[in-house]
Amino acid sequence: MAKIGRALISVSEKTGVVEFSRALAGYGVEILSTGGTAKLLREAGIAVKDVSEFTGFPEMLDGRVKTLHPKVHGGILGMRENPAHVAKMQEHGIEPIDMVVVNLYPFEATVAKEDCTMEDAIENIDIGGPTMLRSAAKNNRDVTVVVDHADYAVVLDEMKNSGGSVSCETNFRLAVKVYQHTAAYDGAISNWLGARTGDGVAAFPDTLTLQYKLAQGMRYGENPHQSGAFYVEKGSKEASISTARQIQGKELSYNNIGDTDAALECVKQFTEPACVIVKHANPCGVALGANIMEAYDKAYKTDPESSFGGIIAFNRELDESTARAIVERQFVEVIIAPKVTEAASEVVAAKKNVRLMECGFWPENPAPRFDYKRVNGGMLVQDADLELFTELKVVTKRAPTDKEMEDLLFTWRVAKFVKSNAIVYGRDNSTVGVGAGQMSRVNSARIAAIKAEHAGIPVQGAVMASDAFFPFRDGLDNAAAVGVTAVIQPGGSMRDAEVIAAADEHGIAMVFTAMRHFRH
């Protein structure tokens, strides 16, 4: 590659641009710029030529037209090794531009503001920036294009090692990054405007554009005959499996990631020290405790058999004693916590294959978001299920005691994360038995009781949560038969009166939430 002789720099995000420009000037690079960037560089003592001087044409239309000029785009797009291009550039007095450093008006940050108007949004749609970026990316054999300030150091290192040029390989990588960036930028504009084509603001835009970045490849997908990879959402920041840091252990598998997501999102529901153990995307043991050691011990004892090879999530810092209890007691695939002490890391290091993850802490009230589910030829989109209940209405003659209500709310939170049809038995802020994924709700109840019996835990005196209404009274009859004293469910069945009557017959207290939590 030839040495960089001229760079056009015009950025909204100005992190590091002064230092970068000063370094370019040190290589004798002529710097062209516009507006606020030119002002900033001049104030820093860096020689700058205005683009309007370079083109011989003034900025106009309140700055909407600055760089949309043949001398700019001809200087970027002209192929240096094409004699016809070179001749035309010389004929029209077009000088080459060897580097384009541009980032875009902050459209997404602007529309994220509560008081953003349509005019604000429109004025933050960049036109000249994407045009220059795409021109430079297209001609990446001859032009270096930088859209991310994180790449300034990479470019300067290459220029230092080469005497002022950037390799074709780096130029190509930077060009690909440009197209990824402009695709996401246009997608954000399309999504925002597409929700405003009618009266008011639609819940969902006319078209939906999403961008995910490859986070890791995998040996295989859900099964060994399937290939797999993990992509993360652009701009994802909330504590999650997508943002978590792996401290040690084998590479996360496709199933590890899905199961860890289920465990972490479930444990986020609780403010008290909590432990969630997940197997095949279903909680098999969940408990609260005075500390996470107690919570883990209770959760494990719910279903020791299913906990083997499970995923364990905490909502508090993982300490040495809890880490030791886990690795000495059971085989575990993944442990994830918001923070991990150094001593806990050292304990887990004795089991080199265990994947230890640190995800950071999360806000008590998560921001609204969408859930996506791929179907053949399409995608289902919905609001994430972040709410717990619409109301708490006692519908039976007997109201639950304070202790029963505490356990009902605990099991209700767990039931949100159990595959439907979901039944959860619980007592003393711990699951007693979990029945998941059955086509018949009463069968889920039977399985929950079998699980409890298998673990040697009596159901007598426990409460029950159901993720959806009972269509018949048999669910309540079954609950009474195993000793359940209180039930929480959404209600809404045609036979609610029959189900309530069954509860009253058995002396069971029952609460309706008016909110269903199907999970498929």
From Swiss-Prot:
Q: What Gene Ontology biological process does one annotation of this record name?
A: 'de novo' IMP biosynthetic process
InterPro entries, A to Z: AICAR_Tfase_dup_dom_sf, Cytidine_deaminase-like, MGS-like_dom, MGS-like_dom_sf, PurH-like
**Key words, A-Z:** Hydrolase, Multifunctional enzyme, Purine biosynthesis, Transferase
Q: Does the keyword Transferase apply?
A: yes
Q: Which reaction does it catalyse?
A: (6R)-10-formyltetrahydrofolate + 5-amino-1-(5-phospho-beta-D-ribosyl)imidazole-4-carboxamide = 5-formamido-1-(5-phospho-D-ribosyl)imidazole-4-carboxamide + (6S)-5,6,7,8-tetrahydrofolate; IMP + H2O = 5-formamido-1-(5-phospho-D-ribosyl)imidazole-4-carboxamide
Domain (MGS-like) ranges: 1-147
Q: Which domain of life is it from?
A: Bacteria
Q: What is its EC number?
A: 2.1.2.3, 3.5.4.10
Cite the SMART domains for this sequence: AICARFT_IMPCHas, MGS
| Molecular function in Gene Ontology | IMP cyclohydrolase activity; phosphoribosylaminoimidazolecarboxamide formyltransferase activity
Q: In which pathway does it act?
A: Purine metabolism; IMP biosynthesis via de novo pathway; 5-formamido-1-(5-phospho-D-ribosyl)imidazole-4-carboxamide from 5-amino-1-(5-phospho-D-ribosyl)imidazole-4-carboxamide (10-formyl THF route): step 1/1; Purine metabolism; IMP biosynthesis via de novo pathway; IMP from 5-formamido-1-(5-phospho-D-ribosyl)imidazole-4-carboxamide: step 1/1
- List the record's Gene Ontology CC terms alphabetically: cytosol
Q: Which family does it belong to?
A: Belongs to the PurH family.
Q: Which PANTHER family match?
A: BIFUNCTIONAL PURINE BIOSYNTHESIS PROTEIN ATIC (PTHR11692:SF0), BIFUNCTIONAL PURINE BIOSYNTHESIS PROTEIN PURH (PTHR11692)
Q: What is known of its domains?
A: The IMP cyclohydrolase activity resides in the N-terminal region.
User: What's the name of the protein?
Assistant: Bifunctional purine biosynthesis protein PurH
Q: Organism source for this protein?
A: Geobacter sp. (strain M21)
